[in-house]
Amino acid sequence: MSSSSIVTSLLRPTTAADGVLPRQMAQVNSSCNIWRSKAKVGGINYFNPGNIKCVEEVHKSRQVVVAALKSLEYETEKPTNQDVVSEKMRVLSERIETMLQNMDEGEISISPYDTAWVALVEDTDGRPQFPTSLEWISNNQLADGSWGDRKFVIYDRILNTLACVVALTTWNMHPHKCNRGLRFIRDNMEKLENENEELMPIGFEVVFPSLIEAAQKLGIEIPHIDSPCIKKIQAMRDFKLKRIPMELLHKKPTSLLHSLEGMQGLVWEKLLDFRSDGSFLCSPSSTAYALQHTKDELCLQYLLKAVKKFNGGVPNVYPVDMFEHLWCVDRLQRLGICRYFRVQIKEMLDYVYKYWTDKGICWARNTNVQDVDDTAMGFRLLRMHGYDVSTDVFKQFEKAGEFCCFPGQSTHAITGMYNVYRTSQIMFDGEDILADAKNYSATFLHQKRLANELVDKWIITKDLPGEVGYALDVPFFASLPRLEARFFLEQYGGDDDVWIGKTLYRMPYVNSDTYLELAKLDYKKCQAVHQLEWKSIQKWYRDCKLGEFGLGEKRLLLAYFLAASTAFEPEKKGERLAWAKTAFLVETIASQQLSHEQKREFADEFEHGSSLNMENGGSYKTRTRLVEILSNTVSQLSFETLVAEGRDIKQQLSNTWQKWLKTWEEGGNLGEAEAQLLLQTLHLSSGLDESSFSHPKYHQLLEVTCKVCNQLRLFQNRKAHDAQGGISDLVIGTTFQIEASMQELVKLVFTKSSEDLDSITKQSFFAIARSFYYTAYCDAGAINSHIYKVLFENID
């Protein structure tokens, strides 16, 4: 019988007699039909002529596939519910796509405080320049008489309410609303004394006393004006203003442009040179104050545009396009759903890169002041997506090894230093300023965590201590994608997160329940697939009686966890199972206590299928059975790739295993050999084009990845030895080598060249290195908790 006819026979249509349900039959038959037709015309050369053993292996593999399909419980359990979930995910994805496509200059909530300053502007006839702003104030008083965000922070409510009362009183409008506002101020002013100063809005200590003075000039009686908390705020203003050299304020743009309405003695002729797009650092209140004093046409046009867009109200800062684009990408990535929006993410990052400068960026394009928070976030995301960015952007934020949020400032925000720390971890070798940034930000964050002071002055979020803690405890090189997503699903507050500017504000395209809902559904879907796969891989372990070779299911679970936490997408099933089974078989074989001669015979039997001398009885039988398990697994993985990808990888996969066995036999670098085996198994299983294997960049990535994986394996072994009383000096030295090698790998993965591999292939090298780093870095307790959390813990 010809090989083609044998294939045609073995790949016969699956029927109900095989115990497979209709949908499963269709899955098998659709693939088998292709290969039957190819076999008939000689279009498939799956095995060498005359090698009937390969035919039998194909048949066994086919039976395994059918059995695996029968074990997929989700095929028989609640198919209707799956359809409902899939439809819901589709609707949510389309909704998010619409949001991302409609990004312009930033979706942001309205600030009553800034709207009040705009409402104070009078036209050339002495009437309100912006009557719709007064109308907005009138229509948006809260039930308790205050104005402000639904999140109650007394600084925010008092500032907004007093500003709105001043605006309405100035135009002699709605006295009853003014009285209700003053009643709220009277009843709540003393609460300022006990509020956390980290929640104080930007510039509050400067603008609030000035607002009180403006109210008093209108005859508004301010309750508790002599209270200790008011005197303290006034003292803070006096101290801050004394530290501000007025000549510097008029000499170059600084962050003080954001709060001009709280300052006196301003020389407007000089300050007008510091406008950007008609505004003073994108602040409507600061720009409105300038317009009152200068009648500048560009300031007027900026405010007209903002008032029109927001229907009378204005936000505390606008535009916020750079901020919105970057933080949106960051949230989508950390939630684990960025793969659904690759096109939109590229468009967003292209937009940011278009306005990127050699000094960094701020929250809006074309600003003349930059901040370290937006710059760090932009640098990190751009670098990770292959854009060419220079570390020189951080120079203006550094002085003597210390880093600040704005040039010349000495205060810090937790999130600012948090983003600096995250960015510093993707440094390339020789980028000293990022090394300094990493040391400084890590020390700062560790100290804040120890002091239980992880409260930010820029955002009120669900679990900032959790976000910072994860970053400190699980460095970027160890942060497996699904592990990060699982933690962030609990830390992300969605719509409830609120930002702190001059007032509290919200960014619906950054903090969105829609993102969170899709992310949870996606995670649950993937987790269900992973749990079913774990059952199937347990069955493989038990059917093969692999426990008899000394390694328990716990080691198998770790191997599967590493694969599922990295190649987590449902469609990557083949890669996951190939990774997990390969890693476990490597560990199982390496754990056998065999002589050099026995290792050679093991490798020979796998390569040639020869029968070993049975004179030593059980030892040889056991080893022969392990060879058989290895051979069958290679055949199974090859067949599954044949069906899924249309590629015959049997010979290549066998050759890859032979290389590893040769290294094992000769006592070579097993960490390096295992990394190469895992990488090539992944690439073969994914159907990677054969030309990629000979690409110069492929060989370069392979060399560096294998080197660092070997270093990590040695480090892991030495760390284990150290725990038993070994020498630790060598471990410290190895760590420096590892970091340098990881930086070398990161540079290869994250930089683009004219003749380059595709990004997905390059990322796979980093993924394997990351898995080695994870097991070397994290202790057993952390790993066990991560496994449970990622694979088995339910999501609320």
UniProtKB/Swiss-Prot annotation:
UniProt cofactor(s): Mg(2+)
Binding site for Mg(2+): D371, D373
Annotated signal sequence range: none
GO biological process: gibberellin biosynthetic process; miltiradiene biosynthetic process; terpenoid biosynthetic process
Motif position, DXDD motif: 371-374
EC number: 5.5.1.13
Predominant location: plastid
Name recorded for this polypeptide: Ent-copalyl diphosphate synthase 4
Native species: Isodon rubescens (Rabdosia rubescens)
